Structure formats: structure tokens, C-alpha cells
Amino acid sequence: LFTGRPDGRNVGIAARAKQELEGFVTEPDHRNLEYVTDPQADYDGIAEALLAPRRQLRRWLMEQGLTLLPGSTLSLGDTERFERSDPDNPYHSLIEATYGTAVVTASIHINLGIDNPAELFAALRLVRCEAALLLSLSASSPFLNGRITGAHSQRWLQFPLTPERVPLFLDHQHFITWTNQQIQAGAMHN
């Protein structure tokens, strides 16, 4: 989520939101923040679990003359600099060095809420096969620094930097083994 003024100007308040609002977490660039919900095993509570924190955040932001900005409008901000939420965090240094300063899109990370590892990896394979469709329906950030990029999504232009070939994991051990191999080869970071 991106926060700012009603005119679209970005104002980073992630650290304060994390301190004052339950469930909110900071991102490497403090203009962006996220919240974490508990896993849901059925669909009935998902909409409220996703929307309740946003309502809480909107009320909190209104008290400060701020609002939520759609992810596609962060491009109105300055992408020439990275506004670190924690200058001493080595992970944040890695993100800045790897992706640069043009982190301009918001996202939802989906927790599938599946306890059984075999069922979880079957679901992950399905999501992975449908990922391009899901991204095309959800990712929308065609602007950068107030200009049209020519792409549907800035996110697609820069994320994710993964190894060229990622398998459809058979099970949890396959995932662990492959990930450890990538870390040892320097293709991924942990």
C-alpha cells in the first residue's frame, strides 16, 4: 500500500503505521507498507480479513490529512531515490541494490491457508500455472515518474529476478533442495 496526500504526492509513514496499527509491517522503502492477515481456510472470511485493515488504515491516515494511493500512482513520486525505512537493515540494502529505486507497484501476497504440505504444493503448482493470468488481471502500474512506460505493468518489467528456470515443485523437500542449490550458486538470496 502506498500512502500520501490527496493530490497524489507520496508521503512515507510505514514505520509510524507499524508502531501504531496492529498487523502492519514496513517495506524497504518507507513509502510502501503492508499488512499481514491470519491464514483463512475458507472463503467466507477472506474479504473482511483483507478489507478491515484497509479501513483502519484509511481512518488513521485521514486524521493526518493523508490517504491511500493506488499502486499505479507512485510514479508521481521520485523514483530516483530509495527512501529507506531502516537504513541499517542489510535486506533493505539488497532490495535497493537488486531492484533499484523504481519500486512502483503494490501487491497482495496470498496465503493459501492449507495445512497439508501435499495439498499446498498441488495448489502452488496450480497458482504458478495461472500466475500470468492473475498478474495480468491485478498488476496495473503503467506509469513511471509521470510518464507512460509502454507496459501494462512496471512490476512485470522488473520483478521478479529469479533464476531462468524454476520447476513446478513436486513437494516441500524438492522446494527446499532447489532453493538451497540456488542460494549456494548465488542465483537467489536468503
Task: Cite the ranges covered by each PLM segment.
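Loop-rich catalytic cores of soluble enzymes, especially ATP-dependent carboxylate-amine ligases
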Residues: 102-106, 113-190
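Terminal catalytic/cofactor-binding subdomain
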Residues: 1-99, 104
